[in-house]
Amino acid sequence: MRIIIDDKIPFIREAAAQLGEAVYLSGSDISAADVRDADALIVRTRTRCDEALLQGSRVQMVATATIGYDHIDTAYMQHAGVAWTNCPGCNADSVAQYVQSALILLADAGHVDLAGMTVGIVGVGHVGSSVERMLRRMGCRILRHDPPRQARGEEGFVDLEEIQKHCDVITLHTPLTREGAHPTFHMIDEQFFDALHRRPVLINAARGEVVDEAALKTALKTGKIRTAVIDTWEHEPCVDRELLSAVFLGTPHIAGYSADGKANGTRMALQAVARHFGTSFSAPVLPPALPDDYAYYPQRYSPQHPYAELLRHYDPRRDSDALRAHPEDFERLRGDYPLRREMQANDGI
């Protein structure tokens, strides 16, 4: 079996070698000529998997080691009989810990009060559910908005208007969809900002195009929102530098980039390929966790407080500072991202 693999997928080489011949290429450069004689692809979001790439190839299986799959032409896959899979939930806890750390920093800067604040979670799938669990442990009141789940008759959800009326923080965890009953493309637009009541903080760790960045810049300038934390950008890998300078934190699409989340995605993608071809492999092993060496201690909490411990473990300001210093290096900052383990000890936070 011959597998073409994005060379930035971590923790994969030893395991992939057990499946067959593995060829590693830059994800954005994988071409039709490269995949013509491949049996499977393991990719990330930078590889567009469609007719132009796959027609005439012998590819039977495409696995993306990511939650998102808008880079995969699923209609073509079905038409061509090519199996495909994504990795739902692989980095859910990583994104949730990013949001948690960002909220602690926002509280330390006086933008929010963690005690009793109301958080609106827009999109309550794997990631949104993990965010909900962590924030409930912090004592936050949660309002949940997820129209597809609500349409299936599930309970405990509110309309977007309730989010706009009552929330001090709104955090986005939707997929990017352009069609269907509940499209998310530019769902956060000028009309959304005009209907806000409480000058909330906006967090986008979902997909960049869920937010109309022009409207977001206007909302920041006019004070319709207090500030923003942006991890995903509308025109990635190009970052709007004016917006980057205006937000509280701006990071290079790394909320889900913990080593644990990456390894989960790698393992799930390899498992899908192995199942499809009736083979097996040994799962990758992660190195031990290390404290973040970013020198920051929150003013509002003692060094022994669990929130201080969480920030010592991972402080997103490091990633924000790196992007502000070199916004042109968006892809490099992602590709060369340092080891970051999830803090399993925060189960009690």
Residue map of PLM features:
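Short, well-ordered coil/turn residues at beta-beta hairpins
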Residues: 6, 43-44, 65, 171-174, ...
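Rossmann-like dinucleotide-binding domain for NAD(H)/NADP(H)
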Residues: 199, 205-349
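Phosphate/diphosphate ligand-binding glycine-rich loop within oxidoreductases
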Residues: 39-112
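Glycine-rich adenosine-cofactor-binding loop
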Residues: 7, 88, 96, 115-136
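NAD(P)-binding Rossmann-fold cofactor-contacting core
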Residues: 10, 137-154
